[in-house]
């Protein structure tokens, strides 16, 4: 969907950014740097957070009996409620068949992806297992964070971005999170969107 143009539902990129600014201007909102969510949870400053399953164990420890997880909420765009989307991805374990030690590489790949290792990764980090037997276990099926991730997956798009995407996206996110943009300045919002698209679409050198 081209949020820098006009969506099939009639929303423009400017409309969406205004909705985002409405969230970040709320005094209850706190922008948390990448990798710092666990520290902020431990500080007791957060009543809720938007994060991934990698922070589930910390959140469970901090919130105790009050711990819960769900899909992302809707937010206001114009006069309507719009479901927040997300990106979804996965990681391959690949082996270079031309490697000098390709045999050992295959053994390592088999070890990382086998049932025992995938169970261990889930037990220690609550990461979604790729092994079918582990994924079908009661502990995985009943996991609160993974259930929330599954619910959000209906609104997620596969992550297909180039290497030039991340820096412009970070800059754009900081403009919103820090309140640099004003919801009353359509031109400045559109310029920020144009810069984001231009940077993300730049050729990889």
Can you annotate each of these PLM segments?
Residues 12-19, 100-112, 120, 185-188, ...:
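Short amphipathic alpha-helical coupling segments at ligand-binding clamshell hinges
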Residues 2-31:
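Glycine-centered hinge/linker elements that transmit conformational signals in sensory
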Residues 1-2, 87-95, 166-177:
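Periplasmic solute-binding protein
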Residues 29-42:
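Short helix-initiation/N-cap motifs at beta->coil->alpha
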Residues 47-52, 68:
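Paired acidic/hydrophobic, glycine-rich loop segments that form the ligand-binding mouth/hinge
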């Amino acid at each position: 969907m081209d949020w820098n143009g006009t969506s099939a539902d009639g929303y423009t990129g400017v409309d969406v950014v205004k909705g985002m600014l409405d969230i970040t201007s709320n005094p209850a909102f706190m922008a948390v740097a990448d990798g710092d969510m666990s520290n902020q949870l431990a500080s007791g400053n957060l009543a809720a957070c938007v994060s991934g399953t990698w922070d589930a164990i910390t959140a469970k420890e901090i919130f105790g009996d009050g711990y819960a997880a769900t899909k992302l909420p809707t937010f206001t765009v114009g006069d309507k409620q719009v479901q927040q989307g997300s990106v979804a991805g996965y990681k391959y374990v690949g082996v270079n068949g031309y490697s000098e030690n390709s045999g050992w590489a295959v053994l390592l790949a088999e070890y990382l992806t086998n049932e025992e290792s995938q169970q261990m990764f889930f037990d220690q980090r609550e990461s979604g297992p790729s092994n079918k037997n582990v994924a079908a276990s009661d502990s995985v099926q009943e996991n609160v964070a993974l259930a929330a991730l599954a619910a959000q997956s209906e609104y997620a798009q596969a992550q297909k971005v180039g290497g030039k995407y991340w820096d412009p996206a970070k800059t754009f996110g900081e403009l919103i999170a820090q309140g640099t943009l004003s919801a009353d300045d359509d031109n400045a919002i559109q310029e920020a969107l144009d810069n984001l698209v231009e940077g993300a679409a730049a050729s990889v050198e």
